[in-house]
Structures are given as structure tokens and as C-alpha cells.
């Protein structure tokens, strides 16, 4: 496959006004995508965005570019990423476009595409779009220009879709839930979903102003929701990230429930109902505790590379349905085509209701093992991981950890770093093992 110049593993992303994230590129990208997408299909594209102040600028630029290529554009306004995927399918659009940098600060933004079935755009189509970007922009004739309209009921459509994933014979009456929207795209969606299902909802991170997205709130900053759950005496908390495709939870004791624990709950519930197909896909960073807990239930477990794109690829390869990352990207292909924080939360709540159990009770059988990550910077072209000294240190640690431990060494994809991750039963022992390997990496670099 050819090397991609613009698209990364999750679209195009960067600091606004520099590099690739400029209005000029967005205009040209809209036109290039329109040229490729107009070759077949309905000539209709949906655009959604999160709450960053730069979203308006990029929305206008993309809209102009797509229109110049002859495509009709339907604007959703601020809506979660999974909502764009869902409405792309239901409107039979040729593609969906999301303007978001997910969990990044407000000064970053990004653009990613969904295909007509709500999945991430095929690599070959991204390469075709990149090829068009190299050409001069040529507007279609005036009578062929695309029109622009707004989906007035996008919010209501998506709220009903989310609620449809909860059992019709159950409610959330009697539950007090703190919902943290990260001042992001779910601010007008998530609280309404859980309230309409009957819960008492305390919303935080629900007042976006364009520059406060993910600022000390949301799934990547859990201190505030943990504190709020305790002070409000809530049963649990649900924290979403800026574009709503990631979830972390909090139990009534104020303890964080991460993506690995959520996967365990969903797998156990699916197995109990006889609907679990195959096993569960995690990543190289998934806690060993998840692997061991699933083994105890005879549920297969497989690891992909880090990134929800790779989780999806392995799910499709194995024909399994449930997978995700410890960071909170949760995929359940029986309930959608992409990670959806709100729907994942609903599925956990459904499991709680079906089993008449608390979040603490559902996660109790899974023991999270201590995990230590040490980053070691290196210079030059030499690969420290090929060093005999590093290999010997890794082998020594692995032999001492045995079946209840794990070592992972990998290069960072963005920085000159070797990431040393060690898991085991005792935190101090794990820390010592991680430092032993890190010292070997340092001496080899």
C-alpha cells in the first residue's frame, strides 16, 4: 500500500492554523473527498463536529469544498462522533465527516471520514482522496453545485437510537448517575438519554464555550467526576471524552472503572445471555487481569496493536463482536459500527439491571494487576530493543513473573521513546522489574 501523506490512523489531526489543520486544506480536502465520493452513491455527505471554537471555521471550509465538487451537504452541528456514523447510515449518505480532535485540547482539531455503512473510511479511498489533493481545485458548473441543508432533528434521532439499546422492559428509576460530558459533543445528548430512561442525572462538563473541551473534565481527567460521585452520594458516574466515542466509569466508592473492566462486564453479560460470539479483543496495553478473568470463564481473549482501528480489524478477522481499549474505546458490533461512549454506558447499566447488581459487584471477580509504564528516551538510529542486554533483562523478568505477569517493550510511534510496561501481582516488585529493564534499555541506547 502507498504511504499516506495526510491521513493518519484516525484521519487528519493537528494544531489549528499550522501544519495540515488550516482552512485552506479543509477546503481542498472537502473538494478532493467530494471528487472521489461523487463517482458513485447518493452525492450526499453529512458533517458533524464537536464543540471546539475552530469547528465553525472547518465546517464552513469543508462545506464549500464539498459543494464545489457537486455534493450536497447536511449539517448536524455539535454531535458525538458515533452519532455521525449512525446518521450517515440512516440517511443513506455516501459519507460522514467528523470535525474533532477527540480527547485533545481545544487548540487542536481534526477531520475524519466515515463510509456509507458508518465504519471508518477504507484505506484505498483515503489514498484516492490524497491523490486528488495534489490536483488544482476545479469547481463544477454552477447548475451542478451542491446544496447545503441542516438536519434539524439530529439530536432527537440520536437520543432515541441510544435509548433503543436499553431493554424495553427496564428503567433506570432509582439510580443517581453523574454524567461528565467533557464540555464536548455529548453535552446536550448524554444527560437527556439517561434522564429519559428514568435516572436522576447530575451533569458536569455540560457547558461548552469553545475553549474548555476536555479541560480538567471528561474521560481523560477523572478527578472531578470521582469527587462529584462521592459528594453527591451517586450510584455511579459516566465520563465521556470530547467527541463521545470513549467512556470511563466510576463506582459508588469513587473508584475509576476503565475500559478493560467495562469489557469484562459486557463479555460476562453476553455470555450469561447466550449471545457472546467468540471472545473479546483487547490491545497490547490491556491489563493482564482482564485476560485472566476471561480465562476463568472460558472466554477467549486476543490482543491487537494499540488503537481502536486495530481492535476493529481483529474483531472482523476473528468474527467476534466485543473489543476495546483500556482507555475507554469500546466496540460492540451488535450495537454499532464504531466506539460509542453513551451506548457502552447503556449496555453496562442494562447488565446491572438484568443481574440486579451494582457496578462494584459486576467488576469484583476481575482483579486488576499493578501495571507500571516507564518511558526511556533514546537517540540515534540504533534499536535498543535488539540489544542482547535488553533481551536478557526481559527474559529474566518474565521468568520471575511467571503466568501472573507480563512484559511489553515497544517503540513509540511519535517520539524517540522505548515504552517499558511490566505487570504482576505486587506493585513494588513490578516497579523494580520495570526499572531493571529500563536501565538495560538506557545502557543499550
UniProtKB/Swiss-Prot annotation:
It holds the Pfam family PGM_PMM_IV. Mg(2+) binds at residues 102, 241, 243, 245. Belongs to the phosphohexose mutase family. One of its GO terms (cellular component) is cytosol. It comes from the Bacteria. It is an enzyme of class 5 (isomerase). Activated by phosphorylation. The lineage of its organism: Bacteria, Pseudomonadati, Pseudomonadota, Gammaproteobacteria, Alteromonadales. Binds 1 Mg(2+) ion per subunit. Its cofactor is Mg(2+). The active site is at residue 102. GO terms for biological process: carbohydrate metabolic process; peptidoglycan biosynthetic process; UDP-N-acetylglucosamine biosynthetic process. GO terms for molecular function: magnesium ion binding; phosphoglucosamine mutase activity; phosphomannomutase activity. Its EC number is 5.4.2.10. Keywords: Isomerase, Magnesium, Metal-binding, Phosphoprotein. This is Phosphoglucosamine mutase 1. It comes from Shewanella sp. (strain MR-4). Catalyzes the conversion of glucosamine-6-phosphate to glucosamine-1-phosphate. It catalyses: alpha-D-glucosamine 1-phosphate = D-glucosamine 6-phosphate. InterPro entries: A-D-PHexomutase_a/b/a-I (IPR005844), A-D-PHexomutase_a/b/a-I/II/III (IPR016055), A-D-PHexomutase_a/b/a-II (IPR005845), A-D-PHexomutase_a/b/a-III (IPR005846), A-D-PHexomutase_C (IPR005843), A-D-PHexomutase_C_sf (IPR036900), A-D-PHexomutase_CS (IPR016066), Alpha-D-phosphohexomutase_SF (IPR005841). Coiled coil: none annotated.
Amino acid at each position: 500500500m502507498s504511504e499516506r501523506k495526510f491521513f493518519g490512523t484516525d484521519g487528519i489531526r493537528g494544531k489549528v492554523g499550522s501544519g495540515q489543520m488550516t482552512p485552506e486544506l479543509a477546503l481542498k480536502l472537502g473538494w478532493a473527498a467530494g471528487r472521489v465520493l461523487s463517482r458513485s452513491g447518493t452525492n450526499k455527505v453529512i458533517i458533524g463536529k464537536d464543540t471546539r471554537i475552530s469547528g465553525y471555521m472547518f465546517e464552513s471550509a469543508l462545506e464549500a469544498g464539498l459543494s464545489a465538487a457537486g455534493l450536497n451537504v447536511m449539517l448536524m452541528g455539535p454531535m458525538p462522533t458515533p452519532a455521525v456514523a449512525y446518521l450517515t447510515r440512516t440517511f443513506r449518505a455516501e459519507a460522514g465527516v467528523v470535525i474533532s480532535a477527540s480527547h485533545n485540547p481545544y487548540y487542536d482539531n481534526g477531520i475524519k471520514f466515515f463510509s456509507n455503512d458508518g465504519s471508518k473510511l477504507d484505506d484505498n479511498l483515503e489514498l484516492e482522496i490524497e491523490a486528488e489533493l495534489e490536483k488544482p481545485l476545479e469547481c463544477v458548473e454552477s447548475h451542478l453545485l451542491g446544496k447545503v441543508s441542516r438536519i434539524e432533528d439530529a439530536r432527537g434521532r440520536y437520543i432515541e437510537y441510544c435509548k433503543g439499546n436499553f431493554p424495553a422492559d427496564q428503567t433506570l428509576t432509582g439510580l443517581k448517575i453523574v454524567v461528565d460530558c467533557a464540555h464536548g459533543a455529548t453535552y446536550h445528548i448524554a444527560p437527556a438519554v439517561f434522564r429519559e430512561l428514568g435516572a436522576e442525572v447530575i451533569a458536569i462538563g455540560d457547558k461548552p464555550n469553545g475553549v474548555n473541551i476536555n479541560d480538567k473534565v471528561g474521560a481523560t481527567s477523572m478527578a472531578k467526576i470521582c469527587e462529584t460521585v462521592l459528594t453527591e452520594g451517586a450510584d455511579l458516574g459516566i465520563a465521556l471524552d470530547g467527541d463521545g466515542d470513549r467512556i470511563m466509569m466510576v463506582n459508588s466508592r469513587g473508584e475509576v472503572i476503565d475500559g478493560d473492566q467495562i469489557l469484562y462486564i459486557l463479555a460476562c453479560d453476553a455470555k450469561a445471555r447466550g449471545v457472546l460470539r467468540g471472545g473479546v479483543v483487547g490491545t497490547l496495553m490491556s491489563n493482564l487481569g482482564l485476560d485472566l478473568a476471561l480465562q476463568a470463564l472460558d472466554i477467549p481473549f486476543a490482543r491487537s496493536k494499540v488503537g481502536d482501528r486495530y481492535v476493529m480489524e481483529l474483531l472482523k478477522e476473528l468474527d467476534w463482536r466485543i473489543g476495546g481499549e483500556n482507555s475507554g474505546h469500546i466496540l460492540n458490533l451488535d450495537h454499532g459500527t464504531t466506539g460509542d461512549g453513551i451506548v457502552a454506558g447503556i449496555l453496562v447499566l442494562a447488565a446491572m439491571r438484568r443481574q440486579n447488581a451494582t457496578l462494584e459487584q459486576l467488576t469484583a471477580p476481575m482483579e486488576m494487576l499493578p501495571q507500571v509504564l516507564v518511558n526511556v528516551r533514546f537517540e540515534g538510529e540504533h534499536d535498543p530493543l535488539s540489544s542482547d542486554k535488553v533481551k536478557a533483562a526481559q527474559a529474566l523478568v518474565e521468568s520471575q513473573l511467571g503466568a501472573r505477569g507480563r512484559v511489553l517493550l515497544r517503540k513509540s510511534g511519535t517520539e524517540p521513546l522505548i515504552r517499558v510496561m511490566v505487570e504482576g501481582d505486587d506493585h513494588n516488585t513490578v516497579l523494580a522489574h520495570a526499572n531493571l529493564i529500563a536501565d538495560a534499555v538506557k545502557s543499550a541506547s
